Amino acid sequence: PGQSIQAAIERAPEHPTRPYTIFIRKGLYEQKVIIDKPNIVLVGEDRDNTIIRIAETEEKRMIETYRGRKVHHGVIVLTEEADSCVITGLTVYNNYGTVVEPGNTRHQMAIFGRADHTIIINSNVWADGNDALSLWANQKDGGGMYYHADLDLRCKGVDFLCPRGW
């Protein structure tokens, strides 16, 4: 694989007015990805062989803060600023319940988001615990519009898809 996915996101304009596409080559990326800009498009080369994987829970996080703000747990985290982002062609896997505490099924999000107009398609979204895909846009701002298609959602707990919105 190439350089870090996070480094590519950081090189994107702060407020892109059109989609900013980041192509991710096949390989295993053991890194947390934080999207804090709108219009970011992550495109994996091969859904089954472009894998972003970490092991974390709310209590045991790789990163607590990013750019001075608290960051939620999850392999990919979309902050409030990450509206209109697309994730496609990836396997996103939180394997905490396999490698750190076997059998533990507490919340182990693969993708967590607070952004609006999030599109996740043609991807595997896996977690060893509850809430593999959890998008929670701010309801008071009218947020919560999501589109999902052609997903393989897996979790060993409950709520493989835990949305708030429409």
Language-model segment annotations:
Residues I22, V41-E45, T88-G89, S123-V125:
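Well-ordered beta-strand segments characteristic of repetitive beta-sheet solenoids
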Residues E10-H15, E30-V41, I52-V86, Y96-D116:
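Extracellular beta-strand-rich solenoid/capping regions of secreted or surface-exposed proteins
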Residues G27-L28, D46-D48:
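Acidic glycine-/aspartate-rich tracts in secreted/extracellular proteins
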Residues D46, E56, T91:
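Short, small-residue-rich loop/turn micro-motifs
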Residues L78-W166:
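Right-handed parallel beta-helix
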